[in-house]
A protein has these predicted regions:
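Residues at alpha-helix caps and immediate loop-helix transition turns in enzyme cores, especially N-
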Residues: 3-7, 69, 98
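Short, acidic/small-residue loops that bind anionic groups at enzyme active sites
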Residues: 73-101, 105-112
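Conserved anion/nucleotide-ligand pocket segment
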Residues: 106-180
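Short, charged, surface-exposed secondary-structure boundary motifs
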Residues: 33, 95-96, 116-121
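Structural motif
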Residues: 20, 55-56, 83-84, 104-107, ...
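Generic secondary-structure signature for well-ordered alpha-helical cores
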Residues: 16-20, 50, 99-104, 130-141
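ATP/NTP phosphate-donor binding region
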Residues: 1-53
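N-terminal glycine-rich "phosphate-gripper" loop used for MgATP/nucleotide binding
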Residues: 56-67, 72, 88
Length: 180
């Protein structure tokens, strides 16, 4: 399910979309929480923001312990080197902190590992590319959803039709702050 080798198909998916994928210095480190140390994760985050060849940063996965990073993040460095940073679930702790401390936009969206999904990938890719590459676009809801373990290719996926109810029809624009 997890680990570097199991997620290489995510790299292939992103490369097939025309992206050059690189990995942080401490990407292969793993402790008892399937993470690396706070020091290593912060160093990797800072290195990615400081590197002019990096245009975007994808969180590897949600990261239930991502809140540990908050006191150690160099928000001045991030403000001076704005770039796309995207993740979901518990990654929203540092996404919202970066927005709050720097004003830089952050993206609640797929993590690197979710690009290994075989089913449900078409909608994810289209929605993500719209957010990453367009200044404005129409947000089109997915026609289906699933809460299956997408990360486990041995488990069957069961998609359900999306049922939408409009409470107040119209258009809106503005800043959305969300999270887990």
């Amino acid at each position: 399910m997890g680990g570097f080798e199991a997620n290489l198909s995510a790299k292939e998916t992103l490369e097939n979309l025309g992206f050059r994928v690189s990995f942080s210095e401490h990407y292969l480190e793993s402790d008892m929480l399937s993470s690396s140390s706070i020091k290593s994760r912060v160093a990797d985050l800072h290195a990615a923001f400081a590197d002019d060849s990096v245009d975007a940063i994808l969180a590897t996965i949600g990261g239930f312990n991502s809140n540990e990073l908050l006191p150690y993040i160099d928000y001045d460095l991030i403000a001076k080197h704005p770039k796309i940073i995207c993740g979901y679930s518990d990654s929203t702790a540092f996404l919202n902190a970066i927005f709050a401390k720097t004003g830089n936009l952050t993206y609640m969206g797929p993590s690197y590992s979710s690009f290994k999904m075989k089913e449900g990938q078409d909608y994810q890719i289209k929605a993500w590319l719209n957010a990453m590459t367009k200044s404005a676009y129409d947000l089109v809801p997915s026609q289906e959803w699933s809460s299956d373990p997408w990360y486990d290719p041995t488990q069957p996926r069961h998609f359900m039709p999306t049922e939408w109810k409009i409470y107040n029809a119209g258009k809106a624009s503005g800043t959305i702050i969300g999270g887990n």
